[in-house]
Amino acid sequence: MSTPTPKVGFVSLGCPKALVDSERILTQLRMEGYEVVPTYEDADVVVVNTCGFIDSAKAESLEVIGEAIAENGKVIVTGCMGVEEHAIRDVHPSVLAVTGPQQYEQVVTAVHEVVPPKTEHNPLIDLVPPQGIKLTPRHYAYLKISEGCNHSCSFCIIPSMRGKLVSRPVGDVLSEAERLVKAGVKELLVISQDTSAYGVDLKYKTDFWNGQPVKTRMKELCEALGGMGVWVRLHYVYPYPNVDDVIPLMAAGKLLPYLDIPFQHASPKVLKAMKRPAFEDKTLARFKHWREICPELTIRSTFIVGFPGETEEDFQYLLDWLTEAQLDRVGCFQYSPVEGAPANELGLEPVPDEVKQDRWERFMAHQQAISAARLQLKVGKEIEVLIDEVDEQGAVGRSWADAPEIDGNVFVDSDALKPGDKVRVRITDADEYDLWAEPV
């Protein structure tokens, strides 16, 4: 008599890079015959992939761990907060195992110890798709090209959690991308901690893909991805000079004209305290140059207000810079101290919470006006949209200017579309975040 199929529940928190880690773990478990179930009650064990970047993320991770313990009782913890095992066990001493980020084998081993795999599992019958298990909709996928980061930003603890930059061989990355495209993926979202540094640790060594030599470097990676016939979107791009190399690829339609560059601030004084590059004037000149080459270029960024030592003058400098930069998509966070971050030792004056809140509100209002004006320029134009979902009100999609979950939507007045469709539309209306359109 065959043994019951072991069942695993999975909760994935945090950024897209953590989501890719979750996909890798789930793919291995499925290859070993485990069934992935969507509810706590159906699972024999639950894995929680945590985020530990800021205090609010840690609080959410602890809350979800507690929920999983209450609903199931057998919980394994992994991910970025796993480097703080004591903090997890102080609150939830009953967790079965705690592992850190990228510790895939340890997570799978911990699952084995709680719920052994089926001894009669036949991997030739229980097939896993060639692209692996994906937690995103079928038509888009995240493509992680490296782990870790070589920067030492004072507000960040990512290097201590995920280590120094380790680039994947370009042949492996391109082979994975090819499998995803063959499986029906229509948009590849390239992610890492520092996409523009890809290959630095390998000294840009030449690898092979489909028998052809390819350098392990951002430009060559993008050239190869751009030949696969799908949308390719770049995230987490540090503004090195080599970013200039990919703008012509965007202008030629090989890559989406979209750059996600986390600037964090504009004041030279604050950037110095953050240990970020302070070339804000040269950055504005580069924006101008990029837009001359590729007029459709969308630039998204994230910023932090209320960093220790930030004055009203620094904040006003940031607002003025935003006016000059005319960014399309922007996120903003109030500074939150992170345990272990170098910023805690700078001895700078903390910004009061009420001042942080006031600056955040002013920042958002300022940028919303910029974003609204830029989106209004699209009214009447025709663009291509990738449909994400369809409901009774119509279809919801995204343009080249919209990454999933963090940017805006394009609401299309049609009931004849389905997720994964690409459709040409005419923009009829806009607000500060979203567009409305009708099929052409």
From Swiss-Prot:
Keywords tagged on the record: 4Fe-4S, Cytoplasm, Iron, Iron-sulfur, Metal-binding, S-adenosyl-L-methionine, Transferase
Residues holding [4Fe-4S] cluster 2: C149, C153, C156
Every MTTase N-terminal domain range: 6-116
Coiled-coil portions: none
PROSITE patterns in UniProt: MTTASE_N (PS51449), MTTASE_RADICAL (PS01278), RADICAL_SAM (PS51918), TRAM (PS50926)
Entry's localization field: Cytoplasm
Known EC number: 2.8.4.4
Cofactor binding note: Binds 2 [4Fe-4S] clusters. One cluster is coordinated with 3 cysteines and an exchangeable S-adenosyl-L-methionine.
GO cellular component term of the entry, any: cytosol
Enzyme class: transferase
Keyword Metal-binding: yes
Top-level division of the source organism's lineage: Bacteria
Known cofactor(s): [4Fe-4S] cluster
Gene Ontology terms for molecular function: 4 iron, 4 sulfur cluster binding; aspartic acid methylthiotransferase activity; metal ion binding; protein methylthiotransferase activity
Catalytic function, reaction form: L-aspartate(89)-[ribosomal protein uS12]-hydrogen + (sulfur carrier)-SH + AH2 + 2 S-adenosyl-L-methionine = 3-methylsulfanyl-L-aspartate(89)-[ribosomal protein uS12]-hydrogen + (sulfur carrier)-H + 5'-deoxyadenosine + L-methionine + A + S-adenosyl-L-homocysteine + 2 H(+)
Primary residence: cytoplasm
Domain called TRAM: residue spans: 376-440
Residues covered by the Radical SAM core domain: 135-373
Metal-binding in keyword set: yes
Described function: Catalyzes the methylthiolation of an aspartic acid residue of ribosomal protein uS12.
Protein name, per record: Ribosomal protein uS12 methylthiotransferase RimO
Gene: rimO
